[in-house]
Amino acid sequence: MSNLRIFAVNQKKISSLHYFNNMCSSKIRASLKRLKLHVLLGRNYSSLPGLIGNDIKSLHSIINPPIAKIRNIGIMAHIDAGKTTTTERILYYSGYTRSLGDVDDGDTVTDFMAQERERGITIQSAAVTFDWKGYRINLIDTPGHVDFTLEVERCLRVLDGAVAVFDASAGVEAQTLTVWRQADKHKVPRICFLNKMDKIGASFNYAVESIREKLKAKPLLLQLPIGEGKAFKGVVDVVRTEKLLWNPNSDDGKDFERKPLLEMSDPKLLKETTEARNALIEQVADLDDEFADLVLGEFSENFDLLPAEKLQTAIHRVTLAQTAVPVLCGSALKNKGVQPLLDAITMYLPSPEERNYEFLQWYKGDLCALAFKVLHDKQRGPLVFMRIYSGMLKPQTAIHNINGNCTERVSRLLLPFADQHIEIPLLTAGNIALTVGLKHTATGDTIVSSRSSALAASRRAKREGEKKQKENNEAERLLLAGVEIPEPVFFCTIEPPSMAKQPDLDHALKCLQREDPSLKVKLDPDSGQTVLCGMGELHIEIIHDRIKREYGLETYLGPLQVAYREAILNSIRATDTLDRTLGDKRHLVTVELEAKPVETSSLLPVIEYAASVAGDLSQASREAFENGVHSACLQGPLLGSPVQDVAVTLHSLVIHPGTSTTMISACVSRCLQKALKKADKQILEPLMNLEVTVSREYLSPVLADLAQRRGNIQEIQSRQDNKVVIGYVPLAEIMGYSTVLRTLTSGSATFALELSNYQAMNPQDQSTLLSQRHGLS
């Protein structure tokens, strides 16, 4: 039985063996001891000898613990709020790492890509598995940079709970709002951790108020800080009326003590904590009827007598219902408050069985999983992160991909430890692991055990659909909600060092696209050049860097350009005929259509059929027409940018017998392009939400600079000693802004960007842009 397999020989692998060693019975520990010796001797050892009977059951419970003991969580926040540092401390205190990683030193576990370690930011979410007090925690560290919003979206899709990390001196920041909205969309329960309580300017009350005001959430204060800024030395457990103090002489924060608050020694702190606990009890009672009955009945006279366990259970229910969010505090960098955060994760966030996933009823215990991330490994090929919702997955078994309608074989299952992986013999519901051997599975694909299982689930969904909705919707309901991929806002050309290297570049880009669906690659039809489309300057830069590091290709990037869109302003009709003979076969088709603007903002064209043709069209002809429309809308007449906010109506389609659907599509595309050229047109440019945090002394030059960039200031807020400028600015005007802002403010300011919408350019700016693009200025 191949229970565990070691793929590399290094110190971190030995660390992971220590981790398993701590959880096993004596016989398994002896086996692991022998295995560790083999690793130290440099051997690739494939099985654990001596695992029999109950020991194998013990190993099974280690690899796949009871579902009630599993927590699938993510850490999310604004950039620089301390997500990765918090993750590193969590791993250290859980016993999964043997030393403290530091973002500034570039030795963190979850930031495993070279670019991440150099830049001090998290780009790809690294999944890590560890145990804490009998619970299995699958933790995913997500990026806070706006260019990597898709990574956050991708991971929230498979989480059961999340920890939102805040900088206690800044409160809710721009990217926090974005991630919070994403968590709301996926109905992910969460708890808040006010980090950096040791930082100068840290304010617990300010941070809590910003959660209440900006996130419209109801904070449950489970802790109070003991001191703020440099005076921060511990926290008060409001639920248990205890104080937690960390030993100032302890280097790693493991040495702390929990003491009850007493009237004699802490009268002021006890009074403050009692008031906070009473307020917490009243708040939870307002949100949970079961708890309200308990409080009003047995403990109405004296809240002090209410057992902490009863309050914790009620907080757990409220958190799951997402009617409020527990709030804790600490300083990950100073090693304070992380262990109580781990306790809160197991206590208040849900297990997989506590989340209500409606689609599980259709699978009746069969395998149902979601592929939520793809990585490429040089030795093992594609590694697919998989969340198992029901059933079981084993190595050397076939699976069916519903999205791709294909069958593949899983060769291995791996337990992820950032870029370190341990092979496991099976994976049960609620768990997250890596699969090896899936060549065609991509991000967002739904995985089941077989095609027959998918058909059986489809029949059950259809029966349910007949009760609740139209029959033609049940097929879509079979697919798990995939990952919403945003449209790119930047693009540039990319060239290999020589034409001989073009196939290598194509392969690298294909692999990177499978890993990162927000990266789009297309071929410029005029120049024949390869074009990269991405979410921001940093995104494109990282891709360029990865091609060099991972694929050994020195590529050349063209100038970074903004991804504009086009729209028409009036209705226009056009007719076209395509008459072509290929071999001895004549293809003849005539089409008449109308293009008109629509008010709803959509990149996809609205396709309509006039009553005179709607009943006569075959399904193949409809598909050919729609393919032609979509093809024409990819390139507008002004800049070759996508055309949005357009409706296309088919009025007539005359097809000569034997005409291929490809020719029909070509004729429709040419006809629609003719209509678009005749219509009045405008260019739409991406508008970015902008938030600049700057000290008072530099506010004026920052505002003056934004005015020159066509910026529109909506609000200027005060945040401690800083000013926060909130507004929006065209993306074209903000390229390279980080360098300018650094110069204007002597490096003291920060900013965050997020795509707001696409807005019509004024005629003067549009004329200038067209002149620049066509080489007239």
Swiss-Prot record:
Its EC number is 3.6.5.-. One of its GO terms (cellular component) is mitochondrion. GO terms for molecular function: GTP binding; GTPase activity. It is an enzyme of class 3 (hydrolase). CDD domains: EF-G, EFG_III, EFG_mtEFG_C, mtEFG2_II_like, mtEFG2_like_IV. It is found in: Mitochondrion. GTP binds at residues 77-84, 141-145, 195-198. The keyword Transcription does not apply. Pfam families: EF-G_D2, EFG_C, EFG_III, EFG_IV, GTP_EFTU. PROSITE patterns: G_TR_1, G_TR_2. GO terms for biological process: mitochondrial translation; ribosome disassembly. It catalyses: GTP + H2O = GDP + phosphate + H(+). Residues 68-353 form the tr-type G domain. Keywords: GTP-binding, Hydrolase, Mitochondrion, Nucleotide-binding, Protein biosynthesis. Mitochondrial GTPase that mediates the disassembly of ribosomes from messenger RNA at the termination of mitochondrial protein biosynthesis. Acts in collaboration with MRRF. GTP hydrolysis follows the ribosome disassembly and probably occurs on the ribosome large subunit. Not involved in the GTP-dependent ribosomal translocation step during translation elongation. Belongs to the TRAFAC class translation factor GTPase superfamily. Classic translation factor GTPase family. EF-G/EF-2 subfamily. This protein may be expected to contain an N-terminal transit peptide but none has been predicted. NCBIfam families: small_GTP. This is Ribosome-releasing factor 2, mitochondrial. The lineage of its organism: Eukaryota, Metazoa, Chordata, Craniata, Vertebrata.
